[in-house]
Curated annotation (Swiss-Prot):
This is Serine/threonine-protein phosphatase 4 regulatory subunit 4. It comes from Mus musculus. Residues 718-739 have a biased composition (Basic and acidic residues). The lineage of its organism: Eukaryota, Metazoa, Chordata, Craniata, Vertebrata. Residues 740-764, 825-859 have a biased composition (Polar residues). Its main location: cytoplasm. Residues 686-730 form a coiled coil.
Length: 875
């Protein structure tokens, strides 16, 4: 055994003493512990706060204002608008006098509450002008000069709202006449500030003569006040005063005051004068702008860099207005200098040598950087105006480098602002939009999601401009000059998906629906469509999953290859509709809802009707419940009599749900759904007046789907014919070489060449070319759920019907040709993608009128029934 360590007993004694010491401390804490009150109020306080329940609202308000506590009085004042709506007469007679008494000694909180209540009453305009003047105006005027600035400003806002309701004479006697004394130097600064704001508000209520005689002397006096705060406040009201006195008095009275204030010793006054001048540019004629205002603006620009940086932020913000207001006045030299000044502001703070000044403390450096960032942000905001200023034709030479700097600015607010303006810049550049392709990629790849969120607000419009704005744009490869577009779009989506900002991710997926306009269906299929599947299967945010589902349906709608369409449909049914996770089956129902909205009725019934109906046997109640909500839309996709067998299957499934459903919530929804289904009117094969527009839209969708399939076949034939044409050309060349020796003889002898005539061949080529052109132009058509007005749809339908009839006649006439590829075709042939597929479950349309375009897709006498794969679902 090892001997015990030395001083072990001492250590033990020390631990025991410490333990006993802690226990004594706890006992002392127990002794000094005070009992906790079980109630916030004593019985006496509760008694004082208790009010008789039988009192009316008016009586209760009077009682609480007279004998209640402050919190009860504040509650009554906050409830004053309700009392005015309920019983205005008694409120004015009994409650309002009590409110006046309370406000004399009220706290700041109660004063603010009263100002808000009075403002609400005035904005509702529920009382006469006489009542407003005699009952409320005096109370408002009495508290305008409250010692608390917040209370005074609240009552001032209420008064300015009351000015709009009061007649001229009331304003003159109750407000304007007292202002003569309130605006004197002997009054407080707060009183004079209030006078400035009131003068700016009431000017528009009087004629020019009254303004000149009664108001302008007060305005001049306040513009020359000894306090810079008063001068600045009055300066900002000169714009409102100028609107009331006309151009002549503005030029003779207001403009000289502004010029004098622009040279004031106080920077805040000079800033107010500059901003007022910018806002009033439209009120001055060309001479005043060129001879008076332009030199002032030039002086402001020079001083802002030399001695007065406080004006830089305001100057950069108002550059757009200055460009617009002074357009056409600049000389070429002044134009160039102003442009250089703008460029300098765009890079302010980015080109400092050796960092900051050593004499500056860190807080000053931070403030200066914030100021410079605000300046560059304002420059980004005004960039579209500067494009107009230099002319879009000169963008590349004058402003492209500046635009590049703004898009690569190190501060997020600057890049965020230029991203907001990107669409405006694209519109202004028009055919020169290709110049900013790289900047679009840069902003799409920006590390900040705020920048991406701002850019994608108008992403479809931007991409559309870029795809059609260039002179060398090609339909199938519009962005060949920007190979990084697709990687940038996919990277932006992945970056949004990895963040917590799911709303940005949802918005981006919604904007992806424009891609069929922009890039080929193969690019969408391989780079985007599979990603939509992944999001639907793995993402945890429901709005994001639904956005991905709708975008996937749009991609499927405009996919140009039959094999790819079948693969997508099969994956939807097998991985979602028959998926093991009930969450995937719910998303399948969401997808079917979008398919009903986007595709034609025949498409839904052919591919998705049976998989949807099969979910009535789903083991999870939530799936069956969601299916019940979808059943009315499923029924609306059926047409009678072609889909009578589908309607019978639907009714059979509903009856089974009614008889076999055990979940009470699902059963309740089933009963409601049955009532809704019974009230629905079925669509007929022939157009009806009630559903004429819907039927016409559906027919348009179906014809577009059929035409897509036809165009795919024609494109295949075109590729085959191009190959044959190349071989025919080589053969023809050899034949001509071999017959060179007998050329003179052949000119005199008729030559008969078997095969189609040149006119017939050229006709068939023209037909194919026109159809291919029409196919390629489909991606430029709008493909939202609502395709437009009835007139547009009618015109489209008539055009397509005429085209179909012409193509049918041409194909019939071409049956006699020797070409095997045309001999096998028939005018009533069924498109390939609408033929039965043994892999995917589909529902054939029932027999109907052969003239109907829907029934022409199938000639089966009996409806084909497809069995779905049995599956076991794990809830």
């Amino acid at each position: 055994m090892h001997p015990p360590p030395p001083d072990a007993g001492v250590a033990m004694d020390f631990g025991q003493n410490s333990l006993f010491g802690y226990m004594e401390d706890l006992q002392e804490l127990t002794i000094i512990e005070r009992p906790v009150r079980r109630s916030l109020k004593t019985p006496e306080e509760i008694e004082r706060l208790t009010v008789d329940e039988d009192l009316s609202d008016i009586d209760r308000a009077v009682y609480l204002l007279s004998a209640g506590q402050d919190v009860q009085g504040a509650s009554v004042i906050a409830n004053l608008p309700f009392l005015m709506r309920q019983n205005p007469t008694e409120t004015l007679r009994r409650v309002l006098p009590k409110v006046r008494e309370v406000l004399h000694v009220a706290s700041v909180e109660m004063q603010l509450t009263a100002a808000v209540s009075f403002l609400t009453i005035l904005q509702e305009e529920s009382m006469s002008v006489h009542t407003c003047a005699h009952s409320f105006l005096q109370v408002i005027l009495l508290h305008l000069e409250h010692r608390d600035t917040g209370v005074s400003n609240a009552w001032l806002e209420t008064l300015l709202s009351a000015v709009e309701l009061l007649p001229k004479e009331t304003l003159r006697h109750e407000i304007l006449n007292p202002l003569v004394s309130k605006a004197q130097l002997s009054q407080t600064v707060q009183s004079r500030l209030v006078s400035c704001k009131i003068l700016g508000k009431i000017t528009n209520k009087f004629d020019a003569h009254s303004i000149k005689r009664e108001i302008l002397p007060l305005v001049k006096s306040l513009c020359q006040d000894v306090e810079y705060e008063v001068r600045s406040c009055m300066c900002r009201q000169l714009e409102n005063i100028a609107q009331g006195i006309g151009a002549e008095l503005t030029k003779n009275v207001v403009l000289p005051e502004l010029i004098e204030l622009s040279r004031d010793e106080s920077g805040s006054v000079r800033l107010a004068a500059f901003e007022t001048l910018v806002n009033m540019l439209d009120m001055f004629d060309t001479d005043d702008r060129s001879q008076t205002i332009l030199p002032l603006v030039k002086s402001f620009c020079e001083k802002s860099f030399k001695a007065d940086e406080s004006i830089l932020i305001s100057l950069s913000f108002h550059l757009g207005k200055l460009c617009h207001g002074l357009y056409g006045i600049f000389t070429p030299d002044q134009h160039l200098r102003f442009l250089e000044f703008y460029k300098k502001l765009c890079t302010l703070g980015l080109q400092q040598e050796n960092g900051h000044n050593e004499s500056q403390i860190p807080s000053q450096i931070v403030e200066q950087e914030k100021k410079y960032t605000s300046v560059r942000k304002n420059c980004a905001y005004n960039f579209p105006a500067m494009i107009v200023f230099v002319d879009p034709k000169n963008f590349h030479m004058e402003l492209y480098s500046t635009f590049f700097c703004l898009c690569h600015d190190p501060e997020v607010p600057v890049r965020h602002t230029i991203a907001i303006c990107f669409y405006e810049v694209s519109k202004l550049l028009n055919s020169g939009v290709h110049l900013i392709h790289k900047e679009l990629i840069t902003l799409l790849q920006d590390e900040s999601l705020e920048v991406l969120d701002a850019l994608i607000n108008h992403l479809p419009e931007i991409l559309e401009l870029m795809s059609t704005g260039g002179e060398n744009s090609v339909q199938e490869n519009k962005f060949s000059s920007v190979p990084d577009l697709i990687p940038a779009l996919t990277a932006a989506e992945q970056r949004a998906a990895a963040s917590l900002k799911w709303r940005t991710h949802e918005k981006l997926l919604q904007k992806y629906t424009c891609l069929p306009h922009i890039i080929s269906s193969d690019q969408i299929y391989y780079r985007f469509l599979q990603r939509m599947f992944t999001i639907m299967m793995t993402n945890n945010v429901l709005p994001v999953q639904r956005a991905a589902a709708r975008t996937l349906c749009i991609f499927l709608r405009y996919n140009r290859k039959q094999e790819q369409r079948h693969e997508v449909i099969q994956k939807l049914i097998e991985q979602l509709g028959q998926g093991k996770s009930y969450w995937n089956r719910l998303r399948f129902l969401d997808t079917c809802e979008f398919i009903i909205e986007i595709f034609s009725r025949s498409f839904f019934c052919k591919y998705f009707f049976l998989p949807v109906i099969e979910l009535t046997h789903d083991p999870v109640a939530n799936v069956r419940m969601k299916l019940c909500y979808l059943l009315p839309k499923v029924k609306s996709a059926l047409k009678i009599p072609a889909d009578m067998h589908l309607l019978q299957q639907l009714e059979m499934c509903v009856r089974k749900l009614l008889c076999q459903e055990k979940d009470k919530d699902v059963l309740a929804i089933v009963k409601k759904t049955v009532l809704e289904l019974d009230r629905m009117e079925m669509s007929m094969d022939m157009f009806q007046k009630k559903n004429y527009e819907k039927d016409l839209l559906d027919q348009e969708k179906e014809r577009e789907e059929l035409l897509f399939l036809e165009m795919e076949q024609l494109e295949k034939e075109k590729h085959q014919s191009d190959g044959r044409l190349a071989s025919d050309k080589s053969f023809e060349k050899k034949r001509r070489d071999s017959r060179t020796s007998t050329q003179s003889l052949s000119k005199n002898l008729p030559i008969s060449v078997p095969g189609p005539s040149s006119s017939t061949a050229s006709t068939s080529k023209e037909i194919k070319k026109s159809k291919l052109t029409r196919s390629q132009s489909f991606n430029n058509q709008a493909f939202h759920a609502k395709y437009g007005t009835l007139d547009k749809c009618a015109s489209k339908s008539s055009t397509l019907a005429h085209t179909s009839s012409v193509s049918g006649l041409v194909r019939t006439a071409m049956l006699s040709l020797t070409d095997d590829s045309f001999r096998t075709r028939n005018a009533s042939s069924v498109p390939a993608s609408f033929s039965p597929n043994p892999v995917m479950p589909s529902t054939s349309r029932g027999p109907g009128n052969t003239a109907d375009p829907k029934s022409s897709g199938s000639k089966d006498a009996q409806p084909r029934k497809a069995t779905l794969k049995s599956r076991k679902s794990n809830p």
